[in-house]
Amino acid sequence: MSFFNFRKIFKLGSEKKKKQYEHVKRDLNPEEFWEIIGELGDGAFGKVYKAQNKETNVLAAAKVIDTKSEEELEDYMVEIDILASCDHPNIVKLLDAFYYENNLWILIEFCAGGAVDAVMLELERPLTESQIQVVCKQTLEALNYLHDNKIIHRDLKAGNILFTLDGDIKLADFGVSAKNTRTIQRRDSFIGTPYWMAPEVVMCETSKDRPYDYKADVWSLGITLIEMAEIEPPHHELNPMRVLLKIAKSEPPTLAQPSKWSSNFKDFLRKCLEKNVDARWTTSQLLQHPFVTVDSNKPVRELIAEAKAEVTEEVEDGKEEDEEEEAENALPIPANKRASSDLSIASSEEDKLSQNACILESVSERTEQSTSEDKFSNKILNEKPTTDGPEKAVDEHASDVNLETGAELNDQTVGIHENGREKKRPKLENLPDTQDQQTVDVNSVSEENENNRVTLETNTDCLKPEEDRNKENQETLESKLIQSEEINDTHIQTMDLVSQETGEKEADFQAVDNEVGLTKEETQEKLGKDGTAQKVITSDRSSEVGTDEALDDTQKAAELSKAAQSGEGDEALAPTQTLAEKPTEGPEAGGAEEEPPGGERVEDKQPEQQPAVCEAEGQLTSTSETTRATLEQPETDEVEQVSESNSIEELERLVVTGAEARALGSEGEAAATEVDLERKENAQKVPVKAESQAPAASQPSEPHPVLIPSININSETTENKEEMGALPKPETILPPEPEHEKGNDTDSGTGSTVENSSGDLNLSISSFLSKAKDSGSVSLQETRRQKKTLKKTRKFIVDGVEVSVTTSKIVTDSDSKTEELRFLRRQELRELRLLQKEEQRAQQQLNGKLQQQREQIFRRFEQEMLSKKRQYDQEIENLEKQQKQTIERLEQEHTNRLRDEAKRIKGEQEKELSKFQNVLKNRKKEVMNEVEKAPRELRRELTKRRKEELAQSQHAQEQEFVQKQQQELDGSLKKIIQQQKAELANIERECLNNKQQLMRAREAAIWELEERHLQEKHQLLKQQLKDQYFMQRHQLLKRHEKETEQMQRYNQRLIEELKNRQTQERARLPKIQRSEAKTRMAMFKKSLRINSTATPDQDREKIKQFAAQEEKRQKNERMAQHQKHESQMRDLQLQCEANVRELHQLQNEKCHLLVEHETQKLKELDEEHSQELKEWREKLRPRKKTLEEEFARKLQEQEVFFKMTGESECLNPSAQSRISKFYPIPTLHSTGS
């Protein structure tokens, strides 16, 4: 056995040699150099730890990735190489990299400020424009550096932009980045996070025809800017498939509220978000834009200081009485986005203005008006609807908004925010035992968004006598009037809340003049259920004049409510309500509000709803600015003149009508709402118009603060509890923001709470929630019962000045649900990221395999061509060698034959010459004999003369004879030479013909080979294209399976949540009914005592009848609840099925689109092949013609050559032949005479 076989058996030396990487240290334990001091997070490919160098104490973020093979290790080398090669102040630096025990450690620079999206989540608000400018400029500089170094980031988003404590940013996460080798190189990988993908990247999912370049990062930058301005990226409420379609087909996204932002910002976004790649600006061009001409990073330093500030948390539990009251007064509060509380605190007015310049352009600074849940309440008293239709319209609307917020009832105080102007009005409350006084820190500015209540040094003073409260109310009024006038002088602008998708105005907050002192009252008549006239007084009083009158009104109201509290009654309705509101601009004066969901004005379409807006300039109110209680009364102009008996009769009527109306939708209707006094105060100066337009979807990430009433119930005063109990189901005219959200029924709505990298595959939560309209009351009551108030106080130092910011937030179960949803979406995004990584690896492997196939086939083509040419060249060479040998042999034979023939002829001629010489000798003898016969004396002279004559004649004869022999010899030799030349010509011609035939065969074989190579290359490219599309289909199906799985999980979560909510509602309903029955019975008995005209037996009979009616009503309520639950479950299941169908439809469209692209590409490939073959054949004809012409020319040259040779030798026939020169005929001198 050989040694090599021995090695094969024992696998000696067969292990693949480990590849060494420049920046990765192998077989070194990183924990010997770095100490893990904490965990930072859990990324898509592994955990991220906080590490510290044991020698230098440098901090680093250590990403630990489990890699099972060398191939997986190579996937991360691009990221490591990019990090190692980049040296820029705005790009994180690679500190170290190890590969140890199948774990890849990547240690990068630690940024203590955290990611931008994490900071927004921590502060629960978006960035200001000045902060966005700083982040944008530094990000642009980093991108410009990357693009100059041929690097495409491909995953730019707020989560990959990190803050340092110095106020700078660093770009991170190059896990999916691409490092090109050429400047103009393009990419066609479908990779990145869907919400930030450029349109040209999205198109690469199904078509690789139009690859992208560095400008894809510019689009992602524009999306990231919108994300920083609105907390969420555009279309974040959609599932990724819808997002991809939206990006590809719709117009570029814009800001939700353009009026809030500067023109430079909007123009910068237009330059970034240009769908035409050629028209989109580059990073170098964007760096010249005026939006990024900032030098100081102070806004970011302040932001980081606030985010990293010391936080003190305080949790307050709500009291049971409050919770029960709130169960009757559930208020829709938006909770569909990241919580936001625009805080920006400065130490002086100048600091405030400089720090919040961008905010103050569109959002006024908001004074904190926090209210403690268990200390006081603002009651909203509402008349019970007399008909079911209009009531249900509003109820469904309120319930829809309640549900759409996910029951996330962050009970907070929110003021009306104008564009650069805030009206501050005094808070006066009609509570005998409770008063809440709030002071605003002058050195602080609190800006609050939809789900947060910002509190600055809130002091609550409880249980004061009524006289003290009135006095303090007056003082509070005066102090707040001063503040209001100061701010009114500073900020006089206008802000509109606009729905982004439809452009419809939901509410116009219009600034009003600063003049005070005008008092105006308007009376509106409405018909109640029994046809009696009802009047609502809309009063507009100045902040100074109407204070005493309002105090008198509230005292009257308190007296009347006390008189109605005898017996078991838990509730009594305040009989007098004063309305404070300036006339709105429009056809109807008196501040008439409109109801947007149905496009109906409350005064026109809902006569049973006449909310009383309480005046805040002096009243201790028990009603809200958005609701008006209508009391049955005589035809009078003054509400204060209503008698006590009329009030009680009205209460009784409300009890009866309310009982009938509640059977239809008590659980699903929004309960009566308390509105913070700040709303009332602002409403007196700022008329609110809710335009009656069709509800439409709005941008979910709208950061602009809107009007949201807080829900505050006072459990310490019996009077107010009784007042609230007197209303079985008060109604509420919803504020503009819930109306705004009512339109969010579509996928672009605000129904889901997501993080910045939301990857949820489901449709908008609001699309489901809008289906469950009438299910809110009981679940909201349960949520209210469990809520806690969380106060956060942040203390930090900005430029040497310590700043304290306090925020209050209601903590409910929905908060944990939001966190759970965010976690689930983060998991889904990680799954998507891992899937993309696997796809990228598989694509790279396939590309490598296909490239190898192409190289192999081209190498084989070349080898076959060389082999074929070599074969024919060898044959031609052999033919030429054979021809040469034949010619040489023939020439040798010809020479020998010529020599032999010359010898033979020469021998014969020598014999003939000797004979001729003998003849001449004999003649000479004869002449001599004749001379001897002559006389002797003559003989001598005659002999001499005769000899001379004989010699001359014989010499001439001999010369003539020799010449004749030479001619004969030359003729014979020439004949032989001509024969040989003809023979050679024939052989040469035959050889040339054979050679040309070989050359023809060679060319034909080459042409055939070329054609076969073209066919094989086409088949290979076609098969490779099919393999690529098969891979794409496979990857697309895997993505679709993952999306379907996520959709099913989401649908299951919705069903489980609905089941839980319905279970809670079923459990709560008996308790609510018992409490309600008790209250209604007490009110009924009280009304009997007041109108005691019957005997006790008759009263007892009436009470029995009333109890029977109550039992029947409760049974109807239970039945209605059961039917509603079944309807909700059915609607939800239908919605889930519709969601799945829609998802499958989108998936099928993508698969169909991919198949169409494949068919189109195959068709194009066939057309290209046909064209190439056609062009090759067209080029083949001239090649054949040229070859034949070359062959004819060579034949002609050969013929001319042989012809010229023959002629040249025959030009001088008398000349001695070349051959005869070699074989000379013997002359006379060679023969002896």
UniProtKB/Swiss-Prot annotation:
Superkingdom in the source lineage: Eukaryota
The entry's keywords: Apoptosis, ATP-binding, Coiled coil, Cytoplasm, Kinase, Nucleotide-binding, Phosphoprotein, Serine/threonine-protein kinase, Transferase
Name of the top EC class for this enzyme: transferase
Maturation and modification: Proteolytically cleaved by caspase-3. Autophosphorylated.
EC number: 2.7.11.1
SMART domains linked: S_TKc (SM00220)
Disulfide bonds: none
Cellular component GO terms held in the UniProt record: cell leading edge; cytoplasm; perinuclear region of cytoplasm
Modified residues (Phosphothreonine): T183, T812, T1095
Protein name: STE20-like serine/threonine-protein kinase
